[in-house]
Amino acid sequence: MSVKLKFDYPADGGMVQRSRSFTGVNTLGGRRRLSSARSSLRSKAVTGKSPRIPSNSRAGSSVWGQQPEQVDRIFQALRKGLKDYLESHQTELDFLSSQQRDTKRNSRLAFFYDLEKEIRALERYIRRLEFQISKVEELYESYCIQWRLCQGALNMKRAFSLSPSSRQSRESLLELNRNHRHSLEDMSAMEAELEILLGELHVKMKGLIGFARLCPGDQYEVLIRLGRQRWRIRGRIQTDDRQMWDEEEMVFLPHIHGNFEIKVTEVKGLSSILVGMVTCRSADFFTARPQMMVVDITELGTIKLQLEVVWNPFDSTEVRPLTASASRQSIHSRKGSVYSWTPPNTPSFTEKYFLSMMRQMQDADGSFSIGSRESRGVSLLSYLADSTQALSPPAYEKTSGPPVAQHTVLDAKIQDDDLLKTHTDAEESVEWPSETDTASPSPAGSKRDSIFLFHRYSTPDILKQSGEMSVSAGEGDAQETTNPDEATEQETSFKQETEDRVAVKDRKPSRAQKKAVAKRVSALLEDLNTALEETSNVETLKKLDLQIRQLNHVLKKDLDASQVPSSQTLAVEEEEVLGSFDFLSADCTEDEMPIMSSIRLGNTGIGSFNESTLKSMGLLCQEQRCVSSEDSAEGQVRLRGDAAVKASVTTGVYSLDQALETHLSVCAVLLRALKQSDSDLVHKDIMDELSRQVNVLEKIAALSQKLIDEISAADLLSKTPKGIEVFWKECCESDSAFCCSTEAFLRALRKHFIHKVKAKEPGQTDAVFNQLLHQVQCSGMVASVTLCTAERLTVFQLLVYLSRWSITDFGEHISLLSKEVYLIACLESPKRRRALKKLKGKRISDLQPTGRILQLLAKLQTDANHKVASAASSCLNRASRSKSFRAKAVVHYTDLLKNSNTNVRHEACLALKSLKASESAEQVAELWRSADEDLRNAARETVLSFGKKGQMAFQRMDQIYELQDEAYKNLETEITIL
């Protein structure tokens, strides 16, 4: 509830005051364990920082009236609060680091420096928090040691008091008393040290809430005490329900043995009426986030006091609020400011080399062509070898004269990390200055004055491969010679240093990979069409069939049409040109191809030679399409038939093709599982999963109809839980990627959610993340459904997983999953019986459960230890009361009845008996005639335990088997007579 407030001294107007003390106020330096009391300053306001005052009486009472439990509670709360602070600031640091990676490195952008400065300050603050945590933990260990020493001394004193008195015992008792007193003094000193590390509590007044109890004109006085500190403020209720208070905020220094005492009185003239008094523990406020405290002043809660408490682990001068800083919020807004661009300085070596390379790729008309054959000779050494023609500073300064020759030397700075990073960034994304930015101030500007004033460079002849000539006849300029050994060594070292940086960003798939994925997608569509023709007319299967047909209609049949020329690279174009010579691999002879009048193509498996390629080479005309040779005609018919069957289809985006392949494979696996099972429960689970996959295919079809530049996964993640979008971007390192590798997924999980895993054993974190990856890749609770693509993960699989389990907080979900993984370890350990007994009530309802837990619970029913087996059966019996657990477990165990392993079927049968799953009676009854005697007995007992429904299923299966036996006997008799 919001309350209108007005303060005579708001917190934003000046320095926040320290709380007043009953005995006085020390300076900031006096806070460091000074026990001398100052004169009372009740009459005047406090402008400095109020220190902590451990007076003599306080210290004495602390020595003889120890409260180690309270100190332990403060230690735990302080350590937890510091770790929360560290976690929050670490998250903020990760966010800023991602901003820094996404921001193009440019020394002329002021916002980049602000971001760098913010990151450095945050790193220093995190290091200080880590040091503070280490000090607290070290102090806590020392305190625990002294605590145990005190307890030991007390026990020995008690033992000596019970024994007969003697001289030796009296001396020992004196020594024990001395040691006990020293331990108490050490504990008292440690408590004083701890109080210094407690930080500050900023208490902010938020007003009174009283409904009908608060009337205009009422005056209230609020007194807040914490140990010897106090804060007294007066407030008045205005006619417009606005509340006016003296002060807004006060700073308190927490005490170990002191609690907040809040006293509210109503002031009426010269008298005052006590409204209520409340005590609050200060240990509850050691949290990273601000806490809104609503205190019931009266017993019935008719008047409430609203206070906001913010804990700062350090002094006020070093406070760093957890909320987003102003500099970080203004990063993007500063991009358009005046100082976001400054006049360019002298170009660096990297800029000169990169711009010269772009000049070589530029055509005569000023456009960039990937088909330029002259651009293939671009290299770093070509620029160094022809450095006499390098771009000089006057070209940037826009002088009308010719550029001055400048010799560039490759020194040690070339291999600097920043230079390499700038080089790779420049290759990835080039932002050319606008014409107005590069225009010459003089009217005599010409094309020479443009920023694109470069000369062509080529690789030195001594470094060229055999047969490769990239220097044109018009480029007869003299070039400097370079020692071949030195040049090769320089080029190799440069490539080795830049390989790791470029490899991360240069992951463009090859044309062969794209074709392979497109062919697999086409084959999967054909297989699904065939499979759906044999299935029954179920609503979900109808939708799937309709969606498959829509994909066949929507997807692009020509793989080349989906490529954007502007985004192709030189390597891709080289593959296209080399692919035009596939006819050399064809099965052609001189007799079969006279004067190129007819061409007979053989299936060499190396490449395809279609009509468009022949047209491009001038080997086919309109009249030559109708070949006269019968063999040639048969070859063309066969070629066209194969092309029709194996037509490659694509969405236009490689990662989206991969995602489509994965989900088509999932649909195929689910359809096979649907045919193999005869259980209605399993059918229902598979149908639910198929409906989710149909929705995925609908989204892929909608995305494939967009332009290639507009296809992105960001729209899909906009409605996901908080943090999922940033998490997925880091998994795939791109906004538009629809797939990521499992290694990248696990790395991102470890980075973002490792703090959510409450690891109690070594290796548990990796086990949790691997289990999560397995669950995201799997489909439903059916155990027979296997993984389709174990090496990658799609964004749609992640979305389906979030939808299947109704996840609103991914981090909390991982925390629950970590508990399940720990439960798996407990069920596999010698303490499995204890873990089974603890598994009850809410612990069962919180389970997903995972397939591994269900398998272990079933397996433990046949454990050699009969107590463990009995505990497992009782656990499953208790779990049957949880509807969600029972529904998933019954589907899982019913599907396991089809397993080829006899032991697995036996365990699943016993589990269904414990769960009282009468809906699976038909499937269990089928095991009655199994070859294994134990399995037959378990199936008979399970079916009969289901009551009337089980007996009916048992009788039905018995009749079926009797009819089969009779038919078999008649068949044998007939064979004997014949």
Curated annotation (Swiss-Prot):
Query: Which cysteine pairs are joined by S-S bonds?
Result: none
User: Domain of life of the organism in this record?
Assistant: Eukaryota
> Which regions are flagged for Polar residues bias?
53-63, 479-491
| Region annotation Disordered: where it falls in the sequence | 33-63, 424-447, 465-511
Ranges of Basic and acidic residues composition bias in the record: 492-509
Pfam families reported in the protein's UniProt record = PL48 (PF15903)
Q: Which InterPro entries match?
A: ARM-like (IPR011989), ARM-type_fold (IPR016024), FAM65_N (IPR031780), RIPOR3 (IPR026136)
Give the family this protein belongs to, as stated in its UniProt record.
Belongs to the RIPOR family.
Q: Which PANTHER family match?
A: PROTEIN KINASE PKN/PRK1, EFFECTOR, RIPOR FAMILY MEMBER 3
Name recorded for this polypeptide: RIPOR family member 3
The gene designation is ripor3
